[in-house]
């Protein structure tokens, strides 16, 4: 194959974060090469399954709110630039038992601190407003009106098309075999030969856990197998067209998340947990191989959304890549300021991929970013742990 060998920036891993970075680099006229082991968007990483929730009031920590709001701005901008559908404002409903749901409580505090437009609801109000939901009286909720659903594969598809239109090159089905780094020079080795640049962005998803060591970086990253299911439901209660929102629910058995039915696809639901530890190269991608793949989420639906317990229409398997504290890693390499790292998004990263891409592009071009990414430092104490939970 014939492809130029020297670039300003090479992006290794052209999934959620990397493809966004490639777009923002190419938009500035930066000569960019994106290299991926597959053909993004694809079904081998953490971005497939059609949809992802974007929340602004953030139960994982109110420090994320400005990052989430900037991500939303960028998603709106992307939608203006492409013919692909990027975002639908469904609203996001977060609920759980009052006084026993710290995720819900932090979501409410984040909304209050940042003056977000939300409704606070009691159990009976939840049941009345959304007849598809059945919750006890002692539950409360926060409904965030301006949040909603991102169409994840479309997001990556749009970023790729726009980046390529700007002159970026995307090299697919090309695993990176090795890296060579100096202060103002990087080289990657692939089956198609070597490629060089002055800057490098590494965003390899679950494969960060295996390959960052080649860059002399040791971060405790653990990939996990994650599943979602699509269930037949009462479309008049659970469809987007009838006003059903995306949701996050914290109950005694854990945290669940889901989406309204779009175009009859069924209600989509997942159990936000860290299940089987896996190797991304050998993960079993067959939904239903474990009884709990369907069992856990069906049991939740039977209790809280009984009109969505029809036949399983389909199921998907993807991956979470967890850090010990479940916060991201977005930073420069400790020894080489010409290398930026994005890793460990711990099952809640996709919504931020627009702003992460912007941040990575800024780090690559100027060595700094306008965004506060101190919580994502590669040098934070939590990353000194040898084992993940």
From Swiss-Prot:
Phenotype when changing residue 265 to R/S: Almost no change in activity. Stabilizes SoxA against chemicals and metal ions
MF (Gene Ontology): flavin adenine dinucleotide binding; sarcosine oxidase activity
Result of changing residue 36 to N: 100-fold decrease in activity
The keyword Cell division appears for this protein: no
Effect of residue 14 to I/V: Decrease in activity
Predominant cellular place of this UniProt entry's protein: cytoplasm
EC number: 1.5.3.1
UniProt-listed Gene3D superfamilies: D-Amino Acid Oxidase, subunit A, domain 2 (3.30.9.10), FAD/NAD(P)-binding domain (3.50.50.60)
Coiled-coil annotated residue ranges, if any: none
SUPFAM superfamilies from the UniProt entry: FAD-linked reductases, C-terminal domain (SSF54373), FAD/NAD(P)-binding domain (SSF51905)
Result for mutant: residue 17 to G: Weak activity. Loss of activity
Keyword set, alphabetical order: Cytoplasm, FAD, Flavoprotein, Oxidoreductase
Binding annotation for FAD: 8-38
UniProt effect for mutating residue 14 to D/K: Loss of activity
Broad enzyme group: oxidoreductase
Functional note: Catalyzes the oxidative demethylation of sarcosine.
Additional information: Decreases in function by replacement in the G-X-G-X-X-G motif are suppressed by chloride or bromide ion.
Name of this chain's protein: Monomeric sarcosine oxidase
The encoding gene: soxA
